[in-house]
Amino acid sequence: MKREFSLENTRNIGIMAHIDAGKTTTTERILYYTGKIHKIGETHEGASQMDWMEQEQERGITITSAATTAQWAGHRVNIIDTPGHVDFTVEVERSLRVLDGAVTVLDAQSGVEPQTETVWRQATTYGVPRIVFINKMDKTGADFLYSVGTLHDRLQANAHPIQLPIGAEDQFSAIIDLVEMKATFYGDEKGTAVTEGEIPEEYRAQAEEYREKLIDAVASVDEDIMEKYLEGEEITVAELKAAIRRATIAVEFYPVICGTAFKHKGVRPMLNAVIDYLPSPVDVPAIKGTSVDGDEELERKSSDDEPFSALAFKVMTDPFVGKLTFFRVYSGTLDSGSYVQNSSKGKRERVGRILQMHANSREEISKVFAGDIAAAVGLKDTTTGDTLCDEKNLVILESMEFPEPVISLSVEPKSKADQDKMGQALQKLQEEDPTFRAHTDTETGQTIISGMGELHLDILVDRMRREFKVEANVGAPMVSYRETFRSSAKVQGKFTRQSGGRGQYGDVTIEFSPNEEGKGFEFENAIVGGVIPREYIPAVEAGLRDSLDRGVVAGYPLIDIKAKLVFGSYHDVDSNEMAFKIAASMALKEASKQCDAVILEPMMKVEVVIPEEYLGDIMGNITSRRGRVEGMDARGNSQVVRAMVPLAEMFGYATTLRSATQGRGVFSMTFDHYEEVPKSIAAEIIKKNKGE
């Protein structure tokens, strides 16, 4: 099988946004224009091509990122549609890791919204070049320049229009191209009666002003244009395009375009912008990795001639073919039926079949090349974030980091038959989703599942019922609290047992202290002179790690602390690993009395959008939920309240908001950080956990 499109003519892009900005509809239109779909599915009718799980079609939201291949202007475009709902952050995180560029979709009425900020931050972390598509220009209250302003104010982004709309709301009828200085007029709803022509006289001055601003913004990050600009030379269309491309790929500039995907306006120019300004796999730096032992830094260039390397970014259970592993090829080629090494797990895997995906229909292919995104059937041990590579040229590519779950609930199978099936279902769902955890509570024997939010767990329980036919009773949601130390102490833990014959002996002195937020647990061995033999040191660390999960105040995991092993003693005959493990956990227990142990709770960044008349009530309600109002903005006729509120106080908020605003208020929340729980509430939590 020969390569169909050159690497230079390949684009791997994601479509990302806040919920309801119109991402899935935008992707649908792209597929329609690139000839992949003949009839278009509307999201609100539950017939969209990209949203193929039953729950997605019922709820009209996108949960899993479907990967699709399309063709446009002699290029292959691989598109990943990512969910905008905050509970599915992990889907966005893993798709961004394997993309070369992205289209950020904004709602023209709202501009940048909370989830846009989250996704934008994630894309910046991974250095992903972006184009911004301001969608829904036909919506009441649509305001293009306001939306562009929110990119500057909320994201501090160097984003500038390369198009201007003619008209807005129901008068939106044409788009001005500021690079080529021409206009595209739309004659009908389907976007088929399209004509190109001169910019209407009454819009000419505005277009010239914004073209000048565009050149000015590009010149500030591109020396070639800067020189010509300062010398007053004419900048040609080709030079301006090339400079915008360079600055966009360098993640120093973000071109802004507009349209309304639902009415087919602005979709073709968007596809052209993807080709013109977003990078091909050869325009982005070679991917970095390490040798298997971690000692040597390696890199893999985007080329078919390099050894094969790929990153698995999603695992799914498919009803027809079983386990599907989506992967992005960074270098080399791979034939179906061949063997690869999973270097992250040290396992050899056979790639049974390779499928090219189109939302949820698929086409079998015999070979993949550098830059491709495809799905493999037959991989047994591979999970999200694993590296697959050539067996003779091992490399481990940088993996992904996933946030910790913040909310839990108990699930109990309704019958014995459900119990066995539930175990398998939970295992499969955990393989698919790294932010979903399931464990058995050792004290109550209940199965506890944890995830990123109520909707996240709701959908997973729903999938257990539909896909795995497991009926279960679900408990009320619980907050995932954490514990930490606020002060330092040096403590001893000594475990001795003499019971005839060989005894047990372990003795450690450990300095415990608070660590920086987000740094987790750090262990340092500062033993000198062999007072504890080297072979027992790992047992001390293991004993501490085991005890951390059980907590010291109310049974919640202990985070962000340092433990420095400074002294101890051992017995030639009686000492063993178990004794040192127990001694370490005794030291931690002692430290909890001296280190000012506290309970931490997840704090959520909440944004509430409400009509002005409800402002007082809503702010009062936020304060009554122990929230702090951090700012307010006017957005059209609405007020936007930004606040930091404990997750524990946000359960059922959707219902409260709905009744307080007669259904006119909306809110969104994202996890922000952990904060100490007030003493009175901590006392209640401890009491409840001890069953008093």
Swiss-Prot record:
List the InterPro entries hit by this protein, alphabetically.
EFG_II, EFG_III, EFG_III/V, EFG_IV, EFG_V, EFG_V-like, EFTu-like_2, G_TR_CS
Asked if the record carries the keyword ATP-binding, the reply is: no
Q: Which UniProt keywords apply?
A: Cytoplasm, Elongation factor, GTP-binding, Nucleotide-binding, Protein biosynthesis
**One Gene Ontology term, aspect cellular component:** cytoplasm
Positions bound to GTP? 17-24, 81-85, 135-138
GO molecular function terms noted in the UniProt entry: GTP binding; GTPase activity; translation elongation factor activity
GO annotation (BP), single: ribosome disassembly
Q: Where mainly located? A: cytoplasm
PROSITE patterns according to UniProt: G_TR_1, G_TR_2
Q: What sequence ranges are listed for the domain tr-type G?
A: 8-282
Query: Which Pfam families does the annotation name?
Result: EFG_C, EFG_III, EFG_IV, GTP_EFTU, GTP_EFTU_D2
Give the UniProt subcellular location, in the record's own words: Cytoplasm
- Record-linked CDD domains: EF-G (cd01886), EFG_III (cd16262), EFG_mtEFG1_IV (cd01434), EFG_mtEFG_C (cd03713), EFG_mtEFG_II (cd04088)
Job of this protein:
Catalyzes the GTP-dependent ribosomal translocation step during translation elongation. During this step, the ribosome changes from the pre-translocational (PRE) to the post-translocational (POST) state as the newly formed A-site-bound peptidyl-tRNA and P-site-bound deacylated tRNA move to the P and E sites, respectively. Catalyzes the coordinated movement of the two tRNA molecules, the mRNA and conformational changes in the ribosome.
Q: Which HAMAP family does this chain map to?
A: EF_G_EF_2_B
Q: Which family does it belong to?
A: Belongs to the TRAFAC class translation factor GTPase superfamily. Classic translation factor GTPase family. EF-G/EF-2 subfamily.
User: Which NCBIfam families is this protein grouped with?
Assistant: EF-G (TIGR00484), PRK12740.1-3 (NF009379), PRK12740.1-5 (NF009381), small_GTP (TIGR00231)
Q: What is this protein called?
A: Elongation factor G
Species the sequence originates in: Lysinibacillus sphaericus (strain C3-41)
Q: Which gene encodes it?
A: fusA
